[in-house]
Amino acid sequence: MLPNSIKKYQNSTDLLINIAENDLYSKLIIQLTKDFGLANYDLKISEKSTPDTLKEALNNAIKNLILTDSNTYKTILYIIDVPEEIIQKIDTSDINNYVEAVVFLILKRVWKKVWFRAKYTN
């Protein structure tokens, strides 16, 4: 389900809708909250939030961090393990498109962590 299929998603909305249909959606939210917490950023997202709510919260958090606290933003990317070379290739001419692309990369990476942990634990 994951390794090759994750490439078929074009944006975070498509990815989140698929994840929400999966039993691991709440674990994705828990992992996101944990990763942001490790960077001392309080990401307030309920495990019962909808994919749209989650996407909006992540977009707002990332945009806020880019504009006000670049060190925490970079720390979050490091903790989540988003490749720096991919981040550097994103077009920065429009902040909203940039944020959407970064959120998509974050969600893909965290989803991989959650999926692999669920598949290979037990």
Outline where the language-model segments fall.
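N-terminal leader/targeting peptides and immediately adjacent processing regions
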Residues: 1-29
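Conserved phosphate/pyrophosphate-binding and hydrolysis machinery centered on Walker-type P-loop NTPases
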Residues: 18, 22, 44-52, 92-96
